[in-house]
Amino acid sequence: MRSSIIKEGYQKAPHRSLLRATGLKDEDFGKPFIGVANSYIDIIPGHFFLQEYGRIIKEEIRAAGGIPFEFNTIGVDDGIAMGHDGMLYSLPSRELIADCIETVMNAHKLDAMICIPNCDKIVPGMLLGALRVNVPTVFVSGGPMKAGRLKDGTKVDLASAFEAVGKRARNQISDEELREIECAACPGGGSCSGMFTANSMNTLCEAMGVALPGNGTIPALTKEREELIRKAARRIVEIALDERYAFRNILNKEAIHNAFVVDMAMGGSTNTVLHMMAIAKEREADFDLRKINEIAKEVSHIAKISPALYTVHMEDINRAGGVNAVMNEINRRGGVLKTEALTVSGESMGERIAGAKILDTQIIHTLENPYSAVGGLKILYGNLAEQGAVLKTAAMDAKMRKFTGKAVCFDSQEEAIAGIVGGKVKEGDVVVIRYEGPKGGPGMQEMLSPTSLIMGMNLGDKVALITDGRFSGATRGACIGHVSPEAAEGGMIGLLQEGDLIRIDVEEGVLEVLLEEAEIQKRRASFSPKTKTVASKWLKRYQLLVSNAASGAILKTEL
């Protein structure tokens, strides 16, 4: 056992003495020590109930013959942090969470781990930490929230609430109507109900085989979710001492490939690209951004979920057969999935999904009737994004797939919000929000407030937006993020001027400004990136060490 180093031999009497103070008995020292990495926090709707899930997991681990040690990570609610400087801390929190996992697990030499994430950066943070620790690990999230309903039965979710702000700004709805949406959008505990970042990442945990079936879709606070929690706890005890299930044996290049296949089939959040590239770097898996476009050509988009389609939420995907049904349908086109990949369940991915059926073809489409013949994400390149930019094609209007418009430039999200509300953005424009990348922000804020304002003002099929920042999973429209290189590192996005013509072509995979090379060089000769004064010591360290979005915004280990 890895934990032998803290519990065996006469030299470890002091260590055992400390462990006895926590309640351990003689017979417990021969059992596997299992870390229970929880992320309980009261302020996040997807996490306030995880303390109870942690209790259930510890109960099951003890009953199955293991010794659980629960610890907690931090968490940030991206929705609550949205639209103010709190969002600067969201992406950096991923790195803190990874560091927490590594620190606790390696300091105490625990044998195995079960991770209980749910929302936004907590899932990828725990995945990164688990890769560093490399012990048998099972992921089991808190589960998705159910969709809300208005009095007339209309389904709503958090994206509805954000877009309602834009409608209220244009007096398209009353204060009373806004309040009804506000009170209905998030009806209870769970990760926000659409295919936003949290549910995208929890779904990809299934696709990578690090979680049991149902992890991404079984609603929170249900009997079915509790049973999944219990099964995961029993499973970690079964594999705790089996080196075949060391985390890097499960989360490898094949698992990353499968994650992107499911991402394409279900139209996941653009944040998944950022997080999966970080995971690939941590795993030392050779996975280039261009590979994503290759996968997209092979994978049909067969499940459209909010924000792409407001009538469908994760509970509907669960009822229609879940992730296994999506994967098995995609697998009908042989050679797309890496079916030999091992899962924490013990079977290969091919064995896991075999026999899974679509139970409602109105929710999960067949290969013969896809929403699109290609996947729901696209990486764009061009003189505006030499290292790439990300677009969620699954949630944009078809008429915007070829678009040329005039640049309206803002040097921060706050400037953009004021400009949009103030009427500066008009039909045919391309909103440019820069100096919001990993270094420029610092922290790479999500642009849900400006994108929601654009949608709420009925400009979603008339205006595009590009940024070196990123988007919420709830974002929809012609919104292109993660533009690399970013403005703060001298990227072309920083050289743009008001009125420049920007061309977007999804089919060709192009994002470019229509300028002569001589003009670009003239601007570059006199260009000096803006710098922001950062008061926070943590954000200063982050700004110093963070890489760009094309590399997953991971922290460098050398200056």
Swiss-Prot record:
Gene behind this protein: ilvD
Record protein name field: Dihydroxy-acid dehydratase
InterPro entries from the UniProt entry: Dihydro-acid_dehy_C (IPR042096), DihydroxyA_deHydtase (IPR004404), DiOHA_6PGluconate_deHydtase_CS (IPR020558), ILV_EDD_C (IPR056740), ILV_EDD_N (IPR000581), IlvD/EDD_N (IPR037237)
Enzyme Commission code: 4.2.1.9
Active site: S472 (proton acceptor)
Cofactor section: [2Fe-2S] cluster; Mg(2+)
Modification type N6-carboxylysine: residues: K121
Gene Ontology annotations of biological process type: isoleucine biosynthetic process; L-valine biosynthetic process
Keyword Repressor: no
The protein's annotated pathway: Amino-acid biosynthesis; L-isoleucine biosynthesis; L-isoleucine from 2-oxobutanoate: step 3/4; Amino-acid biosynthesis; L-valine biosynthesis; L-valine from pyruvate: step 3/4
Family: Belongs to the IlvD/Edd family.
Presence of keyword Amino-acid biosynthesis: yes
Binding site for Mg(2+): D78, D120, K121, E446
Cofactor: binding details: Binds 1 [2Fe-2S] cluster per subunit. This cluster acts as a Lewis acid cofactor.
Molecular function via GO: 2 iron, 2 sulfur cluster binding; dihydroxy-acid dehydratase activity; magnesium ion binding
Role description: Functions in the biosynthesis of branched-chain amino acids. Catalyzes the dehydration of (2R,3R)-2,3-dihydroxy-3-methylpentanoate (2,3-dihydroxy-3-methylvalerate) into 2-oxo-3-methylpentanoate (2-oxo-3-methylvalerate) and of (2R)-2,3-dihydroxy-3-methylbutanoate (2,3-dihydroxyisovalerate) into 2-oxo-3-methylbutanoate (2-oxoisovalerate), the penultimate precursor to L-isoleucine and L-valine, respectively.
Keyword line: 2Fe-2S, Amino-acid biosynthesis, Branched-chain amino acid biosynthesis, Iron, Iron-sulfur, Lyase, Magnesium, Metal-binding
GO terms for cellular component: cytosol
Subunit structure: Homodimer.
Binding sites annotated in the UniProt record for [2Fe-2S] cluster: C119, C192
One Pfam family of this chain: ILVD_EDD_N
Record field: catalytic activity: (2R)-2,3-dihydroxy-3-methylbutanoate = 3-methyl-2-oxobutanoate + H2O; (2R,3R)-2,3-dihydroxy-3-methylpentanoate = (S)-3-methyl-2-oxopentanoate + H2O
